[in-house]
Amino acid sequence: YVHKILTGRKADFDHLRQFHGISGFLRPEESITDPCISGHASNSVSIALGMAHARTIRGHKYHVVAVIGDGALSGGMAYEALNSAGDSGEPLIVVLNDNNMSIDQNVGALSRHLAKLRISPRYMRAKTRAKQIFGAIPGGKNIIRGISSINSAVKSVLLPSSLFEEMGFVYLGPVDGHDIKAVCEILQLAKRMKRPTLVHVITKKGKGYQFAEEHPDAFHGVSKFNPFTGQGYSKSSTTFSSIFGQTLCELAAKDGRICAVTAAMPSGTGLSDFSTQFPTRFFDVGIAEEHAVAMSAGMAKQGLKPVCAIYSTFLQRGYDQLIHDVAIEGNINAVFAIDRAGIVGADGATHNGVFDIAYLRSIPGLTILCPSNFAELKSMLTRALYHESGAVAIRYPRGGQGNFTADTTANWASCIYKTSPKHEFASVTIVSYGIMINEALLAADLLSDLGIHVQVWKINEISETYRFLSDEMRHSLGNTVYVLEDAVCNGCLGECLASSLQDDHTI
C-alpha cells in the first residue's frame, strides 16, 4: 500500500479492493512501477533473478531488487531461487522484510534461525567496520581474507551462522527498517556489491498504529475500517470457514485420529480453535502447500485422518502432490478442505478459486463434494472422513451461506438433488452446484414468472456427475440446458456435461 501511495495512487484508495478500484496487490496494468502480478508468496526472488539474467544478457545496467517477507521464506520456492541466485553470482539485491509475521504467526525452523540473526547486530556492525578499516590500508584485502577464514571458524562456534551467506549471498544487516537513514545507507552499500546480496531489515507489522500492532493478523490485506476503533465494516460472523472449523473440532473431540493441516492460514481457514484445543494434532507447515499435501498423504497411510485446509488458489501449488502422493495409490483417505472456492471478490484475480474444478476433475479417484450451505458442509465433512476410502476434496466459498439452507445430502445413492418443476414439462433445465445454487433458483423463479417452465438440478458430487447425469437427464432434459458455475470454462462442469451427453447421443 505504501508503494502504491508513493507511485501516484493515493487518490484511488477510496476504491481499494473494490470493483473497478485498485488491487490490494501489485498489478502492472495499474502502474508501470508494478513490475509484475503479485498475489502468491515466495516467488519474488525467482522473478527478480530472471530479470537480472535478462539485464546481463542484453547488456543493460540497472539494479534488480526483490522484496520478500520472512513469512514467504517458509515456502520452498524461495529456497530454490536463493540457491540458484547464490550459485549464479548474478548481481541481485534481495530485501528480507522480517516482521516475524506472515498472515498468522510465523512457524518453523527458519523463523527460529532469523530470530537468532536478529539478536546479533553487534557482530554484523563490527564485521562491516573491520572490513572498512582494513580495506583502506595497503595489503588490507589480504588481511581481510585471512581474518575472514578465522572469523568463519569462530563465528560457527560462537555466533549463529547466516544461511544466506552459506548459499552464496553477501549478508547485510540486520537493520532497523523504521530508521530511514539506516535503511538508505545499507541499500547504497548493497548497490555497490557485484554479487547476490541480501539486506535483512527488521520491521514491526502495523508500526505506529496501535490496533495493528496489537492485532497484526487482523490487519493483513485490510479493506476499509474505522481508524478510531480499528474495526472493519460489517461482515457475516458465521462463514463456511468458521462452520468448517467448528465441525472439525466436534469430530476431533470424539476421534483422536483426526488431525488438521494448514499452510500458514490457521485463522483464515477457521482452524484457530482447533489449534488451541488439539495442539498435538494441529500442524501449520508455513507457506508450503506441496509439503502440506504430501504430509497429509503420509498421515493417512499410517492410520490417521488428516484434514488439509487450503485456499483453492493456493492448492494449485500442490497439484503434483495431489496426483503423485495422494491419488495414484487409490486408497489414501486424506480430506482436502478447499476454502475460498469460486469468485473471492476483494482479493482479486490472483486469489479467485476458479481453476479447482478443472484441475481436480482431471485426477482419477478423487471425490469432489460441493456443499451449498452450512448443513451440507457438516454432512459432507463427516462423509469424507468416515464413508470414503479414497481422497476427498470439499469445495466451499468465502463468506456465508445464501437463502438455500436445505440439506440435500441425505440420500447419497444419487449425487443429484432435483427441484420439482412448477409445470409438468420443463423446457429449461438449470444445472448448478455449491453456493451458485442460490443464483440458479433465483433465475428459475424469474423465468417461471415469465411463463418459462424451469427445473433446477443441484449437483452435490462433481466427480460422479458423468455416471448419474448421462442416464437421468436423457429422459427429463428440457430443450435448453444452462450450467451455472463460478469456474473457468475449460474443464468446467458444463464442458463435462456437454461431452458426456454428446457421447450418449442425447444431444
What are these regions (language model features)?
Residues L6, T203-Q316, H324-G330, N411-W412, ...:
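Non-catalytic terminal/interface segments that mediate subunit docking, oligomerization
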Residues D12-I22, G86-D104, R122-R125, F283, ...:
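A glycine-rich helix N-cap at a beta->alpha junction
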Residues N99-F244:
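Long, well-ordered, tryptophan-enriched scaffold segments
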